[in-house]
């Protein structure tokens, strides 16, 4: 009894003694902490699968692929063959592969379970034009994960972001000096743009009705604008980005590239497109960008102008157990770690629009975690 009393005293009277009443709760709490500690294993296992080409190997097999068939097809050291099953087991648990009955033997007389791809792994295939593999490789590159080791340091210093603390410069400056990161980032944005644009063009054609000119601000290599230009030949599309981004890019009949700075001036246009731009910037910076967009619309002398924003609208916190809500919170933390931006709920979006001088807005939640937001002067 004396030892138990001393234990309680040293732990500030917090009763951590296991008994029949609290053992389940305490062990459950321990398991929850362990799960959080090792969450990174999910993403790193997926990265490994991509680097080994597992999704494409299984898909190209054309039927359920047994563990022995997969192991033989992988470019690995044969001594590591027994570990493939363990990697695939966690990837199945994560929903990237599934097991189905597979015929084995020369005459197909036996049965064994084989791996097949799922909807999630279809988005990881190399030949899929909407593949998210470039985004995955970019986000899990050591340069992008390093800032998380400096998160607590950042909270205690005066740096604008953990990325600054980790690398000694801002994310955008680092990208302009490191071709590898710039290539990863541009490829990631282009792959995402193909997926998003296909949905927007299919489900939101009315958004572009009667539009004669559109400027894609921060449009990168022009994936979004070129798709819009092809789908709507009557729209004159302009990709507006930093001079070094668009310097060597060639336009077409109704597509051109213009270099500049969105904080200084945006080319005159009827419609401004901001895809995944404003979440990179804090509220003050975002208001500046929106004001420049409003000026561009005014200069066009066209009625019915607007800003089209493709970004997240963080859902109600009551949905905190939902995977979508958690993913939105992940993105918000990512913006905090890499840049000065954030993900916003509807109230925060509305304040931005009001502060920038806009009169009204409309949110259409058709892009999964993101929404299409139309903002009117």
From Swiss-Prot:
GO MF entry, a single one: protein dimerization activity
Tissue: Highly expressed in lupulin glands. Detected in early-, mid- and late-stage cones.
Disulfide cysteine pairs (residue numbers): none
InterPro entries assigned: COMT-like, O_MeTrfase_dom, Plant_O-MeTrfase_dimerisation, SAM-dependent_MTases_sf, WH-like_DNA-bd_sf, WH_DNA-bd_sf
Keyword Cell cycle included in the entry's annotation: no
Biological process, per Gene Ontology: methylation
UniProt keyword terms in alphabetical order: Methyltransferase, S-adenosyl-L-methionine, Transferase
Catalytic center residues: 279 (proton acceptor)
PROSITE patterns: SAM_OMT_II (PS51683)
EC number: 2.1.1.-
Similarity field: Belongs to the class I-like SAM-binding methyltransferase superfamily. Cation-independent O-methyltransferase family.
Alphabetical list of PANTHER family matching this protein: O-METHYLTRANSFERASE
Name by which UniProt lists this protein: Probable O-methyltransferase 3
Lineage per the UniProt record: Eukaryota, Viridiplantae, Streptophyta, Embryophyta, Tracheophyta
